[in-house]
């Protein structure tokens, strides 16, 4: 009998322990799976949004091509300068608004979310004034840069008729942030789909029926964006569930807001975010300029344009994931849940690695066919096929790097991202690419190897910043960030510590 008990103890207890371990592993897996589902629920409608906007740009490009080579070249030149001088600024500045709104929503400070969105709209409207002046004088600037007169004239017309779009974008970016930080991305996606479907008939009416040419293409983009703004306003005003605001927040907002300090808080996040975005966007434009100095500049520039089309398509996916991770991290830090914020960051980075391998496989698989969608020139097709595997390796690093940016944005540390991008793209990427292309004779391939070096540097920096994050400290900073400043408040030192910590971490 004693032997039977001993056998039973020796056998049964380990089985119970194994069962307990399995339950624990199952519980951990379930928690991480639920987090992945939460991130994907935010991100997948954003993927749909991005794809429809991508198709919309193709529609405009097709109409430009139908107007002749000079109009196509002029419109493409205008789009490049619009990205460099306008849209990159708007996108970057909005990231600062997103950092505040995501944490404020997590802290249930809904009035503060609305106030931050309003400040974001004002900031972008003010920014649009110097951009407008720049666009109105773009023909002179292009001629100074030794561009062809005809191309400069076409680009100037396109930009001149695109000026109202700056107003639309000033409302559109903050409204997207407002919905995204509440995880309401499906309504945003539906509104974008409707506006995108209307874009084709609007463009046809303005270009083909009214015969406005390049003016009509520019105006169709303006009308489509104003339609999207109108749809978002209609949803927010009539269909959105109204956010309940607690009384303590009402009193604080009504009696003690220090607008100067709040603007300083916003600008401390918006300006570094803007620098970070612009550094990355501008790097690709510099690569196009460098292509003009290669042995076959025409084929190199054309191939670079085709490759940027595929990187833009692939970028929709990590960018959408990044926005989802940013929202989850910001919401959890705002609600004082540092462990959950850390979990969201880990799960997001895990998803981004899987996405990176998918992007790599896609770019390699289409290396011999992608250029056929744009040209039948053998030399351009050869250059594109040669570079696409390197582009795939770039995307392998770009996916976790972009998601890392989302983690930094959700934890309101944009200065770290700006520093990493500055070093990666301008101290590593462009110099390495230029040396390989011109000094060692790698040519077009060398430029993309430089971009690969930049992405490797970037992903190492982002991973290091994420791994070194003190999540408890970030939760404390979130409390400071999402608290409206009292008139005569005594916690100025805490705010200064928070701002300094955005760089020191």
Swiss-Prot record:
Membrane topology: Multi-pass membrane protein
InterPro entries, alphabetized: MATE_euk, MATE_fam
Traits of the deletion mutant: Smaller and yellowish rosette leaves. Enhanced sensitivity to abscisic acid (ABA) in growth inhibition and seed germination. Accumulation of ABA in leaves. Enhanced tolerance to drought with lower stomatal conductance.
Keywords assigned: Cell membrane, Endosome, Membrane, Transmembrane, Transmembrane helix, Transport
Similarity section: Belongs to the multi antimicrobial extrusion (MATE) (TC 2.A.66.1) family.
PANTHER family associated with the record: MULTIDRUG RESISTANCE PROTEIN (PTHR11206)
Record-given protein name: Protein DETOXIFICATION 50
Originating organism: Arabidopsis thaliana (Mouse-ear cress)
């Amino acid at each position: 009998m004693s032997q039977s008990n001993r056998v039973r103890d020796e056998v049964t207890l380990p089985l119970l322990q194994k069962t307990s371990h399995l339950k624990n592993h199952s519980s951990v897996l379930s928690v991480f799976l639920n987090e992945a589902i939460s991130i994907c629920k935010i991100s997948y409608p954003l993927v749909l949004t991005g794809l429809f906007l991508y198709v919309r740009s193709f529609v405009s490009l097709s109409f430009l091509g139908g107007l002749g080579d000079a109009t196509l070249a002029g419109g493409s030149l205008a789009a490049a300068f619009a990205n460099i001088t306008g849209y990159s600024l708007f996108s970057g500045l909005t990231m600062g608004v997103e950092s505040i709104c995501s944490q404020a929503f997590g802290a249930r400070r809904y009035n503060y979310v609305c106030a931050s969105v309003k400040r974001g709209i004002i900031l972008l409207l003010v920014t649009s004034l110097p951009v407008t002046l720049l666009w109105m004088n773009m023909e002179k600037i292009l001629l100074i840069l030794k561009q062809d007169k005809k191309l400069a004239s076409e680009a100037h017309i396109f930009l001149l008729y695109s000026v109202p779009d700056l107003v639309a974008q000033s409302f559109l970016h903050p409204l997207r942030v407002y919905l995204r930080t509440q995880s309401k991305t499906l309504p945003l996606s539906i509104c974008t789909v409707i506006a995108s479907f209307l874009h084709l008939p609007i463009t046809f009416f303005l270009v083909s029926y009214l015969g406005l040419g390049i003016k009509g293409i520019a105006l169709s983009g303006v009308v489509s964006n104003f339609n999207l703004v109108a749809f978002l306003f209609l949803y927010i005003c009539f269909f959105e569930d109204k956010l309940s605001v607690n009384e303590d927040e009402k009193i604080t907002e009504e009696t003690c807001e220090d607008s100067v300090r709040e603007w300083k808080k916003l600008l401390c996040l918006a300006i570094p975010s803007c620098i970070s975005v612009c550094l990355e966007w501008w790097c690709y434009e510099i690569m196009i300029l460098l292509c003009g100095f290669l042995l076959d500049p025409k084929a190199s520039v054309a191939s670079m344009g085709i490759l940027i089309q595929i990187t833009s398509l692939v970028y929709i996916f990590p960018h959408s994931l990044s926005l989802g991770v940013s929202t989850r991290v910001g919401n959890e830090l705002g609600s004082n849940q540092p462990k959950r914020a850390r979990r969201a960051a880990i799960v997001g980075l895990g998803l981004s690695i899987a996405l990176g391998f998918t992007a790599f496989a896609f770019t390699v698989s289409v290396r011999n066919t992608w250029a056929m969608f744009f040209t039948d020139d053998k030399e351009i097709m050869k250059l594109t096929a040669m570079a696409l595997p390197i582009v795939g390796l770039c995307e392998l690093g770009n996916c976790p790097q972009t998601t890392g940016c989302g983690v930094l944005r959700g934890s309101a540390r944009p200065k770290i991202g700006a520093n990493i991008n500055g070093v990666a793209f301008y101290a590593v990427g462009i110099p390495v690419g230029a040396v390989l292309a011109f000094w060692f004779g790698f040519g077009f391939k060398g430029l993309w190897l430089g971009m690969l070096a930049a992405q490797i540097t970037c992903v190492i920096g982002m991973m290091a910043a994420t791994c070194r994050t003190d999540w408890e400290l970030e939760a404390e900073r979130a409390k400071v960030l999402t608290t409206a400043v009292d008139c005569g408040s005594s916690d100025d030192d805490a705010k200064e510590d928070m701002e300094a910590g955005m760089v020191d971490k």
